[in-house]
Amino acid sequence: MSTTTYYQGNPTLTVDGSPAVRCPDELLERYRAVLDQQRMSWTEHLHLARLLGSGGQGVVFLSQRRGTDEFTLPVALKIFSPARYESMRNYDEAMGRIAQVAARVAQIQQDNLLDVHNFVDRHRIRIMEMEWVDGYDLQRLLTRQLLERTRSRVSAKRWEYLNRVIVTDGPAQPRLKPGIAIAITRECLSALAALHRESIVHGDVKPSNIMLKRTGNAKIVDIGSAFELTNLPKPRTCTPTYAAPEVLEGNDCTPRSDLAGLGYVLIEMLAGLQPFAGLGTYRELLEAKRELPRRLPEILPREVVCNELLMNFCRGLIAPDPMCRFPNAEAADMLKEGAASFQRQLIKGDLAAEYENEIRLWLEELD
């Protein structure tokens, strides 16, 4: 459905009924010429200003899109490395799949999903232009270094509040308080639900792919591993620590696999530790993931363990058998056992906070 209109009504008038302005004829002719051409083109130069990250697929740089009249827009450029491909043909085929997914993600326009601007090539090397997300990814945010930075910049009263409502130290890394962790999880579920409705699986949900923006919102980023269920990639890649058991076993990665990955991230946020730290082999990871639901009371803090609703929600995300997980991301949020019910529980107990604003203030204190 088209939502953009081209208006050809009467010109703007002043209060006495006369035309508000008289545009020069030459300028009007240029305007009409632009419209009559029915196409536009211009040259764009993007400078690789700063490395934002690197991984198995390539590197991501901060850049700027420059326009006229001193307009600039920060953007992120992901440059896909061919190193993992045996031939140019394999690289081209893989990039074609990624481009198809990127085009569909660009049309979803969901607030908690990364916006994709373009997919281009330079000397046959593919580059994806994306929005630059100003904030912190969870992997970087949940470090003792940033927790200490926060402590050094706030008053004793504010520090006590942060520890009670937002974040506190955990066994191996900072842990988020349940209300904040669930607020982030709900926004991630909204992003996954939008993808899954389009039959797209993210395929790599992990802390470094979840950004907290300075607005206080969460956003799932890096769709380089995402794929359409009708066009499965071979071979598939994953981050073993956050991959669902069925993925480690070589079976299909499905929308429920994304839920398991998000569940592992949630447990890490709540526990202040990575539950699979130190495990190096697939066999060790598989065994640990099958045992994780039983081990939750041992690794989660008391304030979580004593909340039956929250414990059942965690188990509904990470169940080793995908058929025992929530049926989809929307259900994980909205069912009686879902994340929304826990937030309603906090509200009834007068324990809730304006979490979006709390995150925004916290990130401001880190700068």
Question: Could you say what each language-model-derived stretch is?
Answer:
Residues 119:
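Activation-segment/catalytic-loop signature of the eukaryotic protein kinase fold
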Residues 343-367:
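Regulatory extensions appended to serine/threonine kinase catalytic cores
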Residues 123-137, 141:
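Conserved short submotifs of the Hanks-type protein kinase catalytic core
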Residues 196-208, 212:
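Catalytic-loop of the protein kinase fold
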Residues 320-324, 330-345:
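Terminal C-lobe "cap" of eukaryotic-type protein kinase domains
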